[in-house]
Amino acid sequence: MSIIDPVNKSKVPQEWINKSNIPGDELEEGIMSGMLVVLSDGSILKRGYTTGTTATVAAKAAVLSLKKEIDHVSVPTPVGLRAHMDVKAKDGHAVAVKLNNDHESDITRGLEFVARAVESDKITITAGEGIGIVTRGGLQSKKGYPAINPRPMQQIMEAVVEAVEEIGIKGASVEISLPRGAEIAKQTLNGRIGVEGGISILGTTGFVEPWNDHLGEMKSDLIRDAAKVVLTTGRIGIRYSTMLFPDYTVVLAGSRISEFMESATGKVAICGLPGLVLKWGDPDMLKDSGFATVSEMIEVEPQGEHIRRAFEKTVEKGKGARIVVVDRDGTVLMDSGEQE
């Protein structure tokens, strides 16, 4: 028996749950709320809420406070769960603080989001100070507009609709701002990608995963200093590598596995999806196979000769590294095991 994580849709095996020190009912409630992530050794990591969810909390609370003082709200998230946060809101002015989480590099933890609301004949959402402005094309928000991505903007709108219906008004004009947004933005890549003057309001799920998906930027130094390191190939690989190897440093290597292996001084594991890991080990694995993709090959012939040979070549190329291949649900398809 396993539980399905409602945020990333991965399976949480019962054996992982059994290893945890948290009582079963309490742990299951935490998992199903989206806030807790269980690792393979039973340890727990805590998710936080995105900038999008925090902005949503502030916006809804500001509208509700037009009628009465508010100290707690529930808002929708893009994955269908409700987010619950404390907030201070009175007379159309709300302050929500972005929750702490176990993502060590989340520089927006503890940041205050401010929303101001006035009654109106329709719903409008505007961005104030501290929210960046898009200065070039190619991003999810249009050039010249505030850097509020479509998913969180929809999330904010849905929450404000809930609020105006709850207090019985026709609409509200809501302005969202971050007093320290411009300051924090200097620590991000926003300036390089074309967002100026503040941070971006982001979040495809509404939740912040408790691991870093940009560790590859730290390159060789991080790997060299790690006693145990997992090299992985993408964001899905990061998720499952963190769960499967809780006492390892997880590094996003992408297509640079070979380069990063040379920097490692301790134990090394390579973990990721078959189309990335196996093709690193055997770039020609699809040649004369009759398959267009590795995913197709895995689905049709999971124990086939081409898969077996590619895994053997990957293990050989790994030079003693443990090779773990997972599918998109986190199921381990192949594992070379601990190397002596």
From Swiss-Prot:
Its EC number is 2.1.1.195. It catalyses: Co-precorrin-5B + S-adenosyl-L-methionine = Co-precorrin-6A + S-adenosyl-L-homocysteine. It comes from the Archaea. GO terms for biological process: anaerobic cobalamin biosynthetic process; methylation. Signal peptide: none annotated. The keyword S-adenosyl-L-methionine applies. InterPro entries: CbiD (IPR002748), CbiD_sf (IPR036074). Keywords: Cobalamin biosynthesis, Methyltransferase, S-adenosyl-L-methionine, Transferase. It is an enzyme of class 2 (transferase). It holds the Pfam family CbiD. Pathway: Cofactor biosynthesis; adenosylcobalamin biosynthesis; cob(II)yrinate a,c-diamide from sirohydrochlorin (anaerobic route): step 6/10. One of its GO terms (molecular function) is cobalt-precorrin-5B C1-methyltransferase activity. Belongs to the CbiD family. This is Cobalt-precorrin-5B C(1)-methyltransferase. It comes from Methanococcoides burtonii (strain DSM 6242 / NBRC 107633 / OCM 468 / ACE-M). The gene is cbiD.
